[in-house]
Amino acid sequence: MNPIVKTFQYGNHTVTLETGVMARQATAAVMASMDDTSVFVSVVGKKAAVEGQDFFPLTVNYQERTYAAGKIPGGFFKREGRPSEGETLTARLIDRPIRPLFPSAFKNEVQVIATVVSVNPEVNPDMITMIATSAALAISGLPFNGPIGAARVGFINDQFVLNPSNTELEESRLDLVVSGTKDAVLMVESEADRLSEETMLQAVVYGHDQQQVVINAINEFAAEVATPAWDWTAPVVNAELKARVADKAATRLSDAYQITEKMARYDEVGSIKNDVVASLLAEDETLDERELRGMLSSLEKHVVRGRIIAGHPRIDGREKDMVRALDVRTGVLPRTHGSSLFTRGETQALVTATLGTQRDAQIIDSIMGEKKDHFLLHYNFPPYCVGETGFVGSPKRREIGHGKLAKRGIAAVMPSVEEFPYTVRVVSEITESNGSSSMASVCGTSLALMDAGVPIKASVAGIAMGLVKEGDDFVVLSDILGDEDHLGDMDFKVAGTDDGITALQMDIKIEGITKEIMQIALNQAKGARKHILSVMDDAIGTHRDDISQFAPRIHTMKINSDKIKDVIGKGGAVIRALTEETGTTIEIEDDGTIKIAATEGAAAKEAIRRIEEITADVEVGRIYTGKVMRIVDFGAFVSVIGAKEGLVHISQIAQERVEKVSDHLQMGQEVQVKVLEIDRQGRIRLSMKEAVADQNPATVQDEQPQG
């Protein structure tokens, strides 16, 4: 074993890349570390593609091992299971910048497996994993047009910070990940606190500039490893056949793309393709149908892009900067806590907001530590939304990714738990889709939260931008359709308020996207966003003054922390009885803050009254109404407040002599008692006869013996 090691400084971090020791049967493998966070990445590529396969089967698996943090997994089996949401999102983060760097004709299966094997709680594994993946692909010999770099950018005290620690991120107004090659940005994923377009663009440029250190280091690493390149060349395109396909289909496809209704257009395009394939096969039976259909797809892309570059109206008849027709409705579901129906052209989202208590918060236990999430956003993309049948089950990677993007867009305007002590769950059901459903979810979420009475800081809208670039000519498109996303060169999603950007996601399929093009896209997106916000504000300009009658109302009270044990009771008996008998949910914090959630005001008031009673201090000399809890030979134990009991001695039951306690008292009987004394051990001495004397002094005086 001859290890090859490359060490370099990346901002404040030391990065080490190593190969040649582990997984030597894989196509390539790299162990990478960044300040005690280590990840092992393997790459395996198949030497031959499956015959007839028309897609690139790239799979990225990212897995966090609990041993990396010195932990043992929970659960019965005590081993890692299916990928968590965080692992799925990181896998997508790795996949997005590397996928466009493989040749479009390359169809061999490639699998990337990244395993986190050691973790420093201050250094998130995602950046070093992206760097390690880039290094592994660079030394694999695969036809990969990399390497790529990766950088996380923070914004603290109006200064950009490279790869901030997790502690620094808590103070940052920006969490932006940018990845690209030496000359081009390929991918951006970010969450921001209403920052300007200029600041966001500067952050992207800053991150791309800083990661050049990584790209140079990987190039040096790959040169030292010196793996021979694969003997792979792209298949030769049959130019004569391509011309025949274009001759038969180009004009018809151009006409079909003037049909503005999606399903009618799809039917016509499908019919044209079938006709052309049948015609060519009739002329020559030796032709390959799959090859013909591939050529038709390429022609379709060329036709649509050519129309856009030439300045013709877009597929649905719009100009380049027009937003589709909007329809905004709130309160569409009677029993949900908040709801909205947001429609933009042929994209529609039914969004609901549900309020719960802090007990409903999601506990996220990862190798980076445990945390609670009080804002949940789930995105569902059923097959019927695109007029198809399909499997319905657990969320796919795309649904998890789109839900996270929508959540990023809203997070900056959500109130803190102190301001609004609820757990909020939003569900976006995509009921129709023709592009930009994640941004429709952002708009629908903002509306549903306002309908639910959640005091968000401002309305949020999202817009998806596209790009078609041919040579030096380019057109930036606002509010792209699904076809424009598929046939274009860039998917650029921006969410924000009137004041600034809250989320930015960018996936670029080609090189040569300049800073100027990104600036145009951001400014065009700003105009579209403000237009959508104005329509949304006409429907509901601010949050409702009150929450839904069906939502739990949370009442907060404070008790002395010494009294917490009294409210909980032995083995939780007191608080369990309180919740069951009042129909409320009660949460107690360590500082004595009690939150009572109830859908009915009377139930909450009763719970508050009983807690106040339980936590009240017993006062010497005060008369209480108590209940006989136990009878003994020398007296009776009577509850004074809640679970607090005191002793009424047999001599304090009545003015006359009492021979037998049970002759005067019964279990459960309510009696008036006066507190005579509380000793050092907290024992309470009570008197029934003193209570009677205090309440009826004249009568008692008459009954006193005369001397």
Swiss-Prot record:
> Its domain of life?
Bacteria
Keyword DNA-binding in annotation: no
* GO CC annotation terms, alphabetical: cytosol
One MF term in GO for this entry?
polyribonucleotide nucleotidyltransferase activity
Subcellular location, record wording: Cytoplasm
Give the residues the record marks as binding Mg(2+).
Answer: D485, D491
Residues covered by the S1 motif domain: 621-689
Q: Where is the KH domain?
A: 552-611
Q: Which family does it belong to?
A: Belongs to the polyribonucleotide nucleotidyltransferase family.
Listed under subunit, the entry gives: Component of the RNA degradosome, which is a multiprotein complex involved in RNA processing and mRNA degradation.
What role does this protein play?
Answer: Involved in mRNA degradation. Catalyzes the phosphorolysis of single-stranded polyribonucleotides processively in the 3'- to 5'-direction.
- Protein name, as recorded: Polyribonucleotide nucleotidyltransferase
Q: Which organism is it from?
A: Photobacterium profundum (strain SS9)
Q: What is the lineage of its organism?
A: Bacteria, Pseudomonadati, Pseudomonadota, Gammaproteobacteria, Vibrionales
